[in-house]
Amino acid sequence: MADLAPKYNPNEVEKGRYQEWLDEDLFKPSGDKKAHPYSIVIPPPNVTGKLHLGHAWDTAIQDTLIRFKRMQGYDTLYLPGMDHAGIATQAKVEAKLRTQGKDRHEMGREAFVKQVWDWKDEYASIIKSQWAKMGLSLDYSRERFTLDKGLSKAVRKVFVQLYNEGLIYRGEYIINWDPKLETALSDIEVIHKDDKGAFYHIKYPFADGSGFVEIATTRPETMFGDTAVAVAPGDERYKDIVGKELVLPLVGRHIPIIEDQHVDPEFGTGLVKITPAHDPNDFQVGNRHNLERINVMNDNGTMNEEAGKYAGMDRFEAREALVKDLKEEGFLIKVEPIVHSVGHSERSGVQVEPRLSKQWFVKMKPLAEKVLENQKTDDKVNFVPERFEHTLEQWMSDVHDWVISRQLWWGHRIPAWYNKKTGETYVGLEAPKDSENWEQDPDVLDTWFSSALWPFSTLGWPDENSEDFKRYFPTNTLVTGYDIIFFWVSRMIFQSLHFTGKRPFDDVVLHGLIRDPQGRKMSKSLGNGVDPMDVVDEYGADALRWFLLNGTAPGQDTRYDPKKMGAAWNFINKIWNASRFVIMNLPEDAKPAHMPDTSKFDLADSWIFDRLNHTVSEVTRLFDEYQFGEAGRELYNFIWNDFCDWYIEISKVALNGDDEELKTRKQENLIWILDQILRLLHPIMPFVTEKLWLSMPHDGKSIMVAKYPETHKEFENKEADSQMAFLIEVIKAVRNIRMEVNAPMSSPIDIMIQIDDDNNKAVLDNNAEYVENFLHPKALSVAADIEAPKLAKTAVIPGAQIFVPLTELVNVDEELAKMEKEEKRLEAEVERAEKKLSNQGFVAHAPEAVINKEKEKKADYESQLAGVRERMKELKESK
């Protein structure tokens, strides 16, 4: 048995332990073919930077499940890996290069991509060190990266097959364009937020000089691409002008007035400018009326030659200059300020530009229908909480085609080639044989395209005979945040169903966001982010893991709070001290925990083993149901309250006594319960439980592969549970009375207990030593009828009324003098609060929160005053 430090020090406990686990190969699957497989593939973090608290939350839950199942005898695989994160990583590297005065276009594709690989290697190393500090039991022999050779092969196969099935196509459509990163974005990579803007009301003159129509737009700079003005069919106001031509202000080009169902006659003037190359609705109108598509912007958001003298200006500078010119030329009617929802790039933060572009798309409807159909079967993906299944189905029911090409250099290059002479398109797993005659598409695939294949591509697919694919796919549980259901979860489901015919995972466990103590989302702009490694350095990985799992429910946000981290450390320190006490009280030749003899149990033994049985049953059930917060509460109550506060204290009498046989029994009971507690806690707190378990008599090389606790029928004893609960209530009631009258534990007291029935009397008579050992009474009376003393404190509990005479504890005259002084103080406080609240100036000008606080203070003082007066009445009556 090892000596334990008097205080829990997480840095000492965790130092070197992870490497020992790796050296012992404890993270690899058992290889036991008779065991049920249980697999989790880690949601691959982006190699953009270090992990944040959200990643820590993800992985704490995943590793808890893996360790739990491993101890239950499952053949577990926890597969690590990382995501290349196309846009995000390229943006980071470009920003770094800019600080060095370098530009990727000047460097060239090959040199730039090498820089990104260097970045990836640096941050992958950091991420792996963070995984180690969190104690994640990952099988690194199976580590994957989304640009690995095997995963790249899977990506190409999926692209080619979907293309051959007509589910991938290339076309010119309106897409979301990021002018800063100069790439297309999918709809869910666009974040809408309210911006200040304006409706610019502009005159569009008739070509025949007969007047003008008024057009309102929020994007006047796109007018250079206008090819029509539309009105609603049958709009009586404009029936006479349909077919007439207008002159585009400052441009001079003629455009027709057309009718189209897109126009809402109730909105604005009922006249809409149509810009087919810069608006998705206008694009559809243009298709219906065969209108020209005029693109007026460059890739970087500057105006092109179509904008005339504004060419080369940034789109917003051009807007300002154009509006000024429209005003000077008499075309601007008015500017109406508004606040409207505008799309912004999730990655760069700039306003997205709807823009005509030739891109690759996935036809989503047939794939979405597979998901919706599968969710009606027994083989559906189960969501925890269940409400998120509706979120998935809602999105799949109204899904749009997915733009998958990105104008980047970092990522999976699209496996499409164009013939240099004929323009013919070739899509294949490899380049055409006469590759010198072909040019590969320069674009790469959306990061989420490869991430969508993660659960099966990491296990060997497309080789469906791969041992890992056959054994561990579908995976069992996906743990992730609810904020990426659309980005990732949904896409994994439809790709898996389409290519493997199976769901990718049985269950999806969704957690919320980690917010700061004020409930705000953590962000760089607010400066309220928390580095999980700083938390680990201060409190330890086990404390962080406990915080992340305890007190949270699936699907709910949580708040990071240093006070809660302190409480987590305190709990582990309590476990440490309890373990140290038990180990120090064992004989040198103590044997590992073994099943105790229940026939020799006293009441406290029967009670604690029944409570242990209940805890094992509940924690196992709650882990299986992913209710980790509830499981944490069960563990906390049993360990802190039942075991530490009561059973250890009760056991001290026997451990310090002369009865060697009783002492041995208590030692054996304590080591069994401690062993079971450490096993119960291990999935959540791997480091400290390993240290403590190896410090006590044990069988096996690691608690990680020890058997998870199970219930034992012989430990069930509900009668002992209720009897001990009654005794505890008696002891707590008397302790509370001592506190109320400021009587120290050493002061002698009489305890008089009036009981309601013979059963409770028997409990007290047969177990009086518990009351005596905890309360040290001068005299203990237990009876059905007791005459209440004149001066006494009373407590009522289920089944009994308790009296503690105060004559020997209280000097009545001294106590009365103290109470009178307190009465005057409280009367003054009540009077002060009343004056303040009756002051009209205070009530009229003070914030509502301040007024309510003052009202609360007054009510509190009044309550205290009533208590003091009641106490004074009791004291006077006793004289």
Curated annotation (Swiss-Prot):
Its main location: cytoplasm. It holds the Pfam family tRNA-synt_1. It comes from the Bacteria. It is found in: Cytoplasm. This is Valine--tRNA ligase. It catalyses: tRNA(Val) + L-valine + ATP = L-valyl-tRNA(Val) + AMP + diphosphate. Belongs to the class-I aminoacyl-tRNA synthetase family. ValS type 1 subfamily. Residues 806-879 form a coiled coil. One of its GO terms (biological process) is valyl-tRNA aminoacylation. One of its GO terms (molecular function) is aminoacyl-tRNA deacylase activity. PROSITE patterns: AA_TRNA_LIGASE_I (PS00178). GO terms for cellular component: cytosol. Catalyzes the attachment of valine to tRNA(Val). As ValRS can inadvertently accommodate and process structurally similar amino acids such as threonine, to avoid such errors, it has a 'posttransfer' editing activity that hydrolyzes mischarged Thr-tRNA(Val) in a tRNA-dependent manner. Its EC number is 6.1.1.9. ValRS has two distinct active sites: one for aminoacylation and one for editing. The misactivated threonine is translocated from the active site to the editing site. The C-terminal coiled-coil domain is crucial for aminoacylation activity. A motif ('KMSKS' region) lies at residues 521-525. Monomer. It is an enzyme of class 6 (ligase). The lineage of its organism: Bacteria, Bacillati, Bacillota, Bacilli, Lactobacillales. A motif ('HIGH' region) lies at residues 45-55. Keywords: Aminoacyl-tRNA synthetase, ATP-binding, Coiled coil, Cytoplasm, Ligase, Nucleotide-binding, Protein biosynthesis. NCBIfam families: PRK05729.1, valS.
